[in-house]
């Protein structure tokens, strides 16, 4: 397959310094709102990259579940490969991609586990079958076949027919950003890139060469 000529030329929008909020979280919320209103497919889907204890990188798509003044929140199995990586090296990079708007957002920062109370609250909001799955799946572990997973989920359902408590190995992380970059595709690959860096407790905004 020849991939050389598969490309898009971007021309829908531009991003100037005057368009940007002083705070990158506010700017992100603006862009996320625009992505939702534009009916972008999976606007909260984000790639999370981490490094394990051997220095090997790994990445996964997860769903952003909250953004606030502290950072970006997602939930996962703490025993999964990404969970073990984040516990070993508590730093992550996130990338949002909204092709319909020709936009990307990159986030880098320190990672912390959420307070158990907050993980409990979110877990209670999940559909019943999803809560069963959190108990049934030893995420990232090799299993002999799918039937084993289905049987485990059924067993959890028999044990917890009404209320499924949060497993201790499942919960949230928050990425506390020290760098956020907004990328807007432009013609001739002269893309707009506006970066915010945290310095001495305040955000510095600067333009990057594409």
Swiss-Prot record:
Substrate binds at residues 7-10, 65, 122, 126, 130, 189-191. It is an enzyme of class 1 (oxidoreductase). FMN binds at residues 60-65, 75-76, 81-82, 104, 139-140, 183, 193. Pathway: Cofactor metabolism; pyridoxal 5'-phosphate salvage; pyridoxal 5'-phosphate from pyridoxamine 5'-phosphate: step 1/1; Cofactor metabolism; pyridoxal 5'-phosphate salvage; pyridoxal 5'-phosphate from pyridoxine 5'-phosphate: step 1/1. SUPFAM superfamilies: FMN-binding split barrel. GO terms for molecular function: FMN binding; pyridoxamine phosphate oxidase activity. Keywords: Flavoprotein, FMN, Oxidoreductase, Pyridoxine biosynthesis. InterPro entries: Pyridox_Oxase, Pyridox_Oxase_CS, Pyridox_Oxase_N, Pyridoxamine_oxidase_dimer_C, Split_barrel_FMN-bd. Its cofactor is FMN. The keyword Flavoprotein applies. Its EC number is 1.4.3.5. One of its GO terms (biological process) is pyridoxine biosynthetic process. It catalyses: pyridoxamine 5'-phosphate + O2 + H2O = pyridoxal 5'-phosphate + H2O2 + NH4(+); pyridoxine 5'-phosphate + O2 = pyridoxal 5'-phosphate + H2O2. Pfam families: PNP_phzG_C (PF10590), PNPOx_N (PF01243). Binds 1 FMN per subunit. Belongs to the pyridoxamine 5'-phosphate oxidase family. Catalyzes the oxidation of either pyridoxine 5'-phosphate (PNP) or pyridoxamine 5'-phosphate (PMP) into pyridoxal 5'-phosphate (PLP). Homodimer. This is Pyridoxine/pyridoxamine 5'-phosphate oxidase.
């Amino acid at each position: 397959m020849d991939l050389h000529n598969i490309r898009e030329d971007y021309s829908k929008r531009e991003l100037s310094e005057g368009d940007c909020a002083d705070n990158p979280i506010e700017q992100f919320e603006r862009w996320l709102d625009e992505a939702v209103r534009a009916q972008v497919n999976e606007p909260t889907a984000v790639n999370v990259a981490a490094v394990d204890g051997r220095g090997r990188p790994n990445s996964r798509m997860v769903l952003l579940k909250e953004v606030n003044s502290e950072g970006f929140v997602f939930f996962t199995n703490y025993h999964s490969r990404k969970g073990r990586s984040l516990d070993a090296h508590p730093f992550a990079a996130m990338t949002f991609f909204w092709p319909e708007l020709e936009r990307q957002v990159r986030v880098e920062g320190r990672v912390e586990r959420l307070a158990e109370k907050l993980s409990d609250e979110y877990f209670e909001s999940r559909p019943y079958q999803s809560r069963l799955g959190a108990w049934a799946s030893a995420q990232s572990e090799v299993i002999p076949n799918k039937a084993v997973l289905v049987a485990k989920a059924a067993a959890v359902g028999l044990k917890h027919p009404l209320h499924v408590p949060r497993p201790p190995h499942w919960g949230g992380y928050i990425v506390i950003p020290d760098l956020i970059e907004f990328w807007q595709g432009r013609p001739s690959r002269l893309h707009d890139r506006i970066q915010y860096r945290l310095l001495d407790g305040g955000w510095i905004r600067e333009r990057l060469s594409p």
